[in-house]
Amino acid sequence: MDDALGALQAQLNAIEDALDACTTQDQRNQLRPSYIQAQLNYQRAVNKIFWANDPKITELVAQMKQTQTSLQELTQELADFAKIITAVSTAVKIGTELASIAK
Amino acid sequence: MKAEVASAVRHFRFAALLLVLGLLTACKTSQEAADAAAQLTNVSQQLTSYYTDLSNQVAETITLQEMHSQLMFQTPMDSSVRAELNTTRQELAKRVAMAQALGKLATAYSALANSKSATDISTAAGGLASECKSIAPLPGGSAIPDLVSVASQNLVEYIRQRKLRKSSEAISQIVSGIQEMFASEIPAYKSLNRRRVEIAQRVAGELLQRDVVDVGPALAPALRPFNLTAKPQPNQTTTEMRTMARVAIQRTGETGIEEFAAATDSLSVALKAASDQVKLAVGKH
């Protein structure tokens, strides 16, 4: 694909060299259809490379979001766990104090 | 009675040793994951900047093609060519979004790897054990607070370690996938950059040819050190000046293309390195 892209770009450059060499506007205008076609051929070849990877990008982004959510949930669960133990600790402390008052 | 106490002490020491060993292993995994997360964050930022820059280059190519078309044909650029260039920009926007998603993933990975949840839980568990100890009939003696605190920390580290390993496995596959995709598209990235530089050179050359360019700034490197500035040309730029400007256009363009190619290869290597670092955290590097 590298070679194909390079060849299309070289073709584009060759037409642009020819455009630079033209001495009249009429000569340039005659080259315009070929120039447009060469531009389209090159840009479509680039886009074809990108399109080939589109399904992979969609899949990778979905995987990244799923893994990110899973990591965030676990981080939050661990943080919540500490809070729960602290709350239980406070409850036990209050219970102990209540029990000592009741004696 | 003495034998029972000695046995209890031996068991306690063995349990404590296991807990310490477990913590050390978990810490190693967490450290490797933290290192991998830092590397991943860095490479995702580089990737986002790279794709954003490339998208901007394509936008600039559209502007340059428009100028070229006006200079060559006195007419706007062909609409179908513009549409194809816009499609290229849309494709690059997808890659910017992908790089940003990698950045968010790296942040979540880093949050878990650097989380002090195990310490927090250990402290909270220690506090709970102290409270339990103050309840008179509870058996176990003074060893309970320390054991509960260390055991809970070890348990949390174990859970975190398992989760980090599992996540590292998934992240390793993701980064490898991105690296492979990036490598397969390198010819297109370099070509898009080259195309922008070349069309800019064409337009600059044509403007120079039409003598509508002030070449004064090109002389700045020679004059600036002596606080001098170029004198504006009264009628037209001399042939020597134009030749000099053409050489500058050619050389600057070539340098730009080489630098972009080197930056592209370097990013590909950085992606591979990040992938390897994540594999270390998986433990199968």
What is the predicted function of each stretch?
Chain B
Residues 2-16:
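Bacterial N-terminal signal peptides that target proteins for export
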Residues 29-32, 283-285:
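Short, solvent-exposed mixed-charge patches
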Residues 35, 39-42, 46-49, 53, ...:
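Charged, amphipathic alpha-helical oligomerization/scaffolding segments
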Residues 54, 58-68, 72, 109-116, ...:
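Secondary-structure edge/capping motif, primarily at the C-terminal ends of alpha-helices
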